[in-house]
Every structure is written in structure tokens, then in C-alpha cells.
Amino acid sequence: MTPSLTIAHIQTAAQTLAAHLSPTPLLNAPTLDDAFGCAVYVKAECLQLTGAFKIRGALNAMLALDDAARRRGVITFSAGNHGQAVAAAAKLTGAPATIVLPESAPKIKVERCRWWGAQTVFYDPAREDRSEVAGRFIQERGLTLIHPFDDLRVMAGQGTVGLECVAQLRERNVVPDAVVVNCSGGGLASGVLTAVRDAWADVPLYLTEAAGLEKWQSALQTRQPEQRQPLTDTVLDGINGPSVGAAPLQTVLAQGHVHAWSVGDAQALGAVRLAFEHLKIVLEPAGAAGLAALWANKAAFTGQRVLVIGSGGNVDAGVFARALTT
């Protein structure tokens, strides 16, 4: 059976990462609460190193490698944010990195991978399997794969987001009525769910994915990892991955009381604007997907307290400008 993530994994990751990464703020604004009709607490992972939560899992996995593996180098496949994170983690630990990216990856994410010193390799999602592309490099060069979500070390690192949220909410004497998390492969969702459920056993989790993909909605019903063809034209690149991870799914199913929502481009762009206007932060559309989903379902949460993970802020200027004028 695929192993599930535990709170002990996350606590160990938090100890490992404490010397390398700073906590991100949990933001709340009266004007945002008024707009939603409920108290909204947004975890600003857009302010983390590399502009997204992904550095937590990537660095936790990198620090677990032995010196020989680091010298040979690492590889990953990514829509961009995990690629940046692996590139940064490799740079910080003295390892070479190769990042396999879709040809449609946002320019800012490609540039940041290269800024951190990584080699970038592109593939066509319509014709190629990203894991097979990475597999060729692994076979030829002996590289170590840092999987974007189906790896307990990565999941544990992402779970430190939830651990911080628990501490920050407790400081304010707030018990959340619901948690909303953007979701693609499931590394962040499984990590946050594990941390939050350790504190509050009954809080429901709402996963948010890209409309037209809905692999998690299906996976929660079939209880099997789902595979989908990525969308060809979307600003939700950060949650446009083709597959549900086996380990994240096992963790989520073991916890239960999990629901799946989906949002489209227009909704996500609207949420980018909401975050900027009320919280003064920059989220990418995928990073604002949870906020968009809550907005679409806000009538069901009137008067409640909702934790939303703002997972990243790596957005091209043109897309951000489009969001502000939507």
C-alpha cells in the first residue's frame, strides 16, 4: 500500500527547514471579510522564497539526499513553480539541476529556473509524457528525481504550510470552519490537511482544481489516482498538471471529509484582483484559485471562518494586468 503522510513527517520537515526558510504571514482584512460575508484568512505563500510554497517540499527533499546524489544532480518536471523550487534548492545545496517544463510555461517561471542556475528542457504535453522525458535524463546521467508531489519528503515540506497556519490561527484564538486549498497533484493539499486535522479533527477541506480537468473530483469517487490531458489554453498553469498523486490521494482518503471544487480562468483572474485590492499581495491565477472557489460558494459560508492558501505569486505582468482590468 502507498504510505500516507503523518504529522510526524511534517514536524520533522519543519525542524529541517527552520534554519533555511521564514514563515509567511496569514493575512486578514475587514474589507475582504465584508465582501465575502465571512472571515477569510489567506496564507500568503506568494511571499515565500521563489514566490510559492513549493520551495518547502523541494528543499526538504534536497536536504535528505546524500552527497553523492547531490553531486550527480537532480531533475524534476513542473509547470514552473516546483521547477523554480528545485532549481533554488539545488543551488542552495550545491547540486546541478535539470527542469523539464511544458512549452507553454510562463516566461517568468522559465527565467527564474534559469536564474537559479538550472538547465531547462521543454516538452509538448500534447505529444510527450513529462515523466518519460525526465526518465531519459535519469537513465543517461544518474540524476535523482525530486517528484513534484508523489514523494513523502516533498509532501512533508508542503505540510509545514499547514503547521504554520495552525500556530497563526491559534495565536488569534481562531478555529477554522473550513480550509480551502488549490490542488493539482495533491502535495500541498495532503500536507495542509494532515497538519490541520491534527489540530482540528473535524474541519472540512475543499480542494480547488481547474475547470475542465476535475481529476480530483473523479479520484475522490473512484479512490484511484486519475490521469487527465492538461488544458491547452489556461492561465491556471500551476494547477494544470495531468495526474493525481498516489501518496497524496492515499493521505487524503485516509483523512476523509474532503470535497472538490473547480474554477475557470475568469474566476481565478477575479480572485487575483480581490487579493491585490484587499490584501495588497500579488497572486498568480492558480495561487488565487482557492479564493476564487470560496467567492463562488460564499453563500454557504456566511458568518464562518475560512482558511485559504494563497499558494503562489509567479505571474507574468501581462496576465496580472489582465486580472486587474477584468
Per-range role (PLM):
Residues M1-T326:
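PLP-dependent amino-acid enzyme catalytic core
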